[in-house]
Amino acid sequence: MVTIRADEISNIIRERIEQYNREVKIVNTGTVLQVGDGIARIHGLDEVMAGELVEFEEGTIGIALNLESNNVGVVLMGDGLMIQEGSSVKATGKIAQIPVSEAYLGRVINALAKPIDGRGEISASESRLIESPAPGIISRRSVYEPLQTGLIAIDSMIPIGRGQRELIIGDRQTGKTAVATDTILNQQGQNVICVYVAIGQKASSVAQVVTTFQERGAMEYTIVVAETADSPATLQYLAPYTGAALAEYFMYRERHTLIIYDDLSKQAQAYRQMSLLLRRPPGREAYPGDVFYLHSRLLERAAKSSSQLGEGSMTALPIVETQSGDVSAYIPTNVISITDGQIFLSADLFNAGIRPAINVGISVSRVGSAAQIKAMKQVAGKSKLELAQFAELEAFAQFASDLDKATQNQLARGQRLRELLKQSQSAPLTVAEQISTIYTGTNGYLDSLEIGQVRKFLVELRTYLKTNKPQFQEIISSTKTFTEEAETLLKDAIQDQMERFRLQEQL
């Protein structure tokens, strides 16, 4: 028979009482009233904060955007097909954040910073809020260093500086993405980290861009954030902020970064969809009232850090699509007013074979020559004015039959200047090559050539300079000025090449 020992039992009870930990955990919960179209209405969640992450029973995460008197409007970061009416939801007490680290370089990720390239997990010890506040006035300095795009038309006439925000705007199929990707390709060896954000694009287009980067060795310094057309609107809306958070991580570590948002029209459309489903009042073009704030808080995060913060920079190139060249629509005017200038791509120029199809007349950089090296200022100072005058003359010359010699010469020079601005895709030029090309055109060396021969001559001239006059490149790179010695070297090269070119053409 088992004997009950009272002392042993009392010891066990005493031990259990001592070990008893009365931990009370308060969880802010609610119940799903309605779910559909990527939106859930929740009853409860009384203590939830605006922008707080909430977790559904089956694991889907959402963001509380609408805090109303009797329910909470939540946008889902997933399809939410398994969420049922009456299931429970709990507030996490966190705001959307992503892990950040150097390991993200060379990877393709989604808006939640999860890899989608099938190359395994990404290790990261730090995290950043997706919606970080933009740097204040004191922590910035004015833009003064050039960010070379490798495109003559931009670097000579619409220069972009490190820390600037320059809008690329144009109709569909006018080469907007090509300008942006060429700029990324040109950052090779420049110690610039690039982030390419694809919003609501076809998966095939994103794959094509990634393949180009891989083939040209640009993925080593690039992160691609992609939310394709079949992604939920919430993730398309978040993708640019995720890209900005990654770029900021490097900027605050005293590095230079370049971020491309391709494109913000689709982000605005995703936000409009979310807002209308949340029953927020629509405004102009059915966009919600805070669509300006959507883009301003994103683009204000691009900055040139002050010397106290290590002079890092984040340059933003947002892309906006127009409908049949209408720059006065709601989203284009908003983004034009936020950015420090715009590059306008024209469908007419593109169809006329002028590529990149940059309309120099209405494109502008509000930073201007502060973002150019001295050599480029010396050589390209007058070219924008000359081209603008040429465009005006050309329009006038269509109606006039007999033109005087000076006008004919000006038209001939303008046509050759326009020809030298043409460039193949994925073929960025160094600063020295650009300077030699512009100098040749603006000083009349191309006037004696037929228009069809201009590009061939310039390609051969650049090759000749590289092989026979390497000092030219060295002078430009080291002094950043167009010295007399550099000019002499260039003049000799042009004359030598012109003689060789003439002989070739005669054969």
UniProtKB/Swiss-Prot annotation:
InterPro entries: ATP_synth_asu-like_sf (IPR023366), ATP_synth_asu_C (IPR000793), ATP_synth_asu_C_sf (IPR038376), ATP_synth_F1_a_nt-bd_dom (IPR033732), ATP_synth_F1_asu (IPR005294), ATPase_a/bsu_AS (IPR020003), ATPase_F1/V1/A1_a/bsu_N (IPR004100), ATPase_F1/V1/A1_a/bsu_N_sf (IPR036121). Pfam families: ATP-synt_ab, ATP-synt_ab_C, ATP-synt_ab_N. It is found in: Plastid, Chloroplast thylakoid membrane. It is a peripheral membrane protein. It catalyses: ATP + H2O + 4 H(+)(in) = ADP + phosphate + 5 H(+)(out). It is an enzyme of class 7 (translocase). The record marks 363 as: Required for activity. GO terms for cellular component: chloroplast thylakoid membrane; proton-transporting ATP synthase complex. It comes from the Eukaryota. One of its GO terms (molecular function) is proton-transporting ATP synthase activity, rotational mechanism. Its main location: plastid. F-type ATPases have 2 components, CF(1) - the catalytic core - and CF(0) - the membrane proton channel. CF(1) has five subunits: alpha(3), beta(3), gamma(1), delta(1), epsilon(1). CF(0) has four main subunits: a, b, b' and c. Produces ATP from ADP in the presence of a proton gradient across the membrane. The alpha chain is a regulatory subunit. This is ATP synthase subunit alpha, chloroplastic. The gene is atpA.
